[in-house]
């Protein structure tokens, strides 16, 4: 969710950081490379796909009249309980805010190929 929202928002700093964090946590390179193409990729679970759909629609509010569609919410509710949906919404709101701060501040992606997991400031 953080990677996809950061990609949509054009935040190189956050995209770079969250990909490095995910790789450090054991995520595969293939899945990381396919986040932007999740609709066509077969490497994501149905729950992950539902979360990515909510992330896209919630990030592209200006592009989608009414925000997240009823269909996307219903699909997400099949995979996540109420607390998990609240966590998803909260995560999405926070990453969108951080993306905007980083883009406005013109924070460049890290120059290093490694990062300290959890590092969030320049």
Task: Give names to the regions the model predicted.
Residues 2-122:
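Hydrophobic alpha-helical segments
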